[in-house]
Amino acid sequence: MKYEKLLPRFLEYVKVNTRSDENSTTTPSTQALVEFAHKMGEDMKALGLKDVHYLESNGYVIGTIPANTDKKVRKIGLLAHLDTADFNAEGVNPQILENYDGESVIQLGDTEFTLDPKDFPNLKNYKGQTLVHTDGTTLLGSDDKSGVAEIMTLADYLLNINPDFEHGEIRVGFGPDEEIGVGADKFDVADFDVDFAYTVDGGPLGELQYETFSAAGAVIEFQGKNVHPGTAKNMMVNALQLAIDYHNALPEFDRPEKTEGREGFFHLLKLDGTPEEARAQYIIRDHEEGKFNERKALMQEIADKMNAELGQNRVKPLIKDQYYNMAQIIEKDMSIIDIAKKAMENLDIAPIIEPIRGGTDGSKISFMGLPTPNLFAGGENMHGRFEFVSVQTMEKAVDTLLEIIRLNNEVAK
């Protein structure tokens, strides 16, 4: 194996349950995330990172790989998140499959679940590689503990394995709660103190992403008028029926299951209530600012029209922006995309530059003034029992980080 400790690190990290909690009001959202951040801080110190500190204000643990050159090199930041998605993460039992043939069905532990190339054709890309997958009872946690392990392996390489590799100052940060959308809300750009950064939080080999959705959340409240159904004619206003009518007024094909690429959507997450009152929760997504604003306006227009027809304000939308397409920031200076693209090409990795149908911590951090695109970390089928990662892709992620650092140093004066 090219990086001897990469896989052991990854296996160690995924066995720690760091599932974030969207119902929590604390930062980080769980005590397990606090404890894991402190553990990572100790590991960072053991590798030789300097100025390692935990920020109580935002749950990030930060450390520095000091420069070993006198050149005026731009400072690079590398970020990954410690939490995992909303799927069982207790008792993660990673399985290792060496020299996968690209065709066989992979049994997930003792469960009835399998990774079948017929269902997951991406498996065919991994012939001859070593795969780490689940036992079918949990997620794997490659999102984003692959990124964490890769960054730690990079730090080990620069500080201990090849300390003569010339580089400028590199800052490392591991944070909480990316999966519940609040991880970067309190990120401290001034404390991180770099010129540009990358999140190592992407998927398959070659992903290089600087365009995300713009995102908003909407809660629609419906006020009904409940009376006995036996005498309800011309009197009852059923809040649940209002919710159904509202949803049906949205564009039929603008839903996640019917969209792809650059197409945006409305996504109904939750609907509950009674004839007296009901509540619908949506997310709104689009890549283009104009269309994003049109979607939010449409949700208000539907409510206004229904209220006018009802003669009362029974439909109340509450819409709140969540994050914005970071391309608006990154495109002002594409040099950090160019250097990452060049690094991959130098390593015979074909860059995959496509819009993310989602967001990253970098979306928010970029709008705080620190451009932060996203690099591949290797995971596939993330957020569930079918998740897997290739060890060889993880190694190439470390290679890519090293090449970015080398190229960044090369252009310095």
From Swiss-Prot:
Main location: cytoplasm
Residues noted as binding Zn(2+) 2 in the record, renumbered to the chain: 143, 179, 383
Active site feature: 83, 178 (proton acceptor)
Pfam families registered for this protein in UniProt: M20_dimer (PF07687), Peptidase_M20 (PF01546)
EC number: 3.4.11.4
Stated regulation of activity: Inhibited by EDTA, by the reducing agents dithiothreitol and 13-mercaptoethanol, and by the divalent cation Cu(2+).
Top EC class of this enzyme: hydrolase
Stated pH dependence: Optimum pH is 7.5.
Cofactor note: Binds 2 Zn(2+) ions per subunit.
Positions that bind Zn(2+) 1: 81, 143, 201
InterPro entries in the cross-refs: ArgE/DapE_CS, Bact_exopeptidase_dim_dom, Peptidase_M20, Peptidase_M20_dimer, Peptidase_M20B
Subcellular location: Cytoplasm
PROSITE patterns tied to this protein: ARGE_DAPE_CPG2_1, ARGE_DAPE_CPG2_2
Gene Ontology terms: biological process: peptide catabolic process; proteolysis
GO MF annotations in UniProt: metallopeptidase activity; tripeptide aminopeptidase activity; zinc ion binding
Catalyses which reaction(s): Release of the N-terminal residue from a tripeptide
One GO CC term, this protein: cytosol
Catalytic temperature dependence: Optimum temperature is 55 degrees Celsius.
Family assignment from sequence similarity: Belongs to the peptidase M20B family.
Subunit and partners: Homodimer.
Protein's UniProt name: Peptidase T
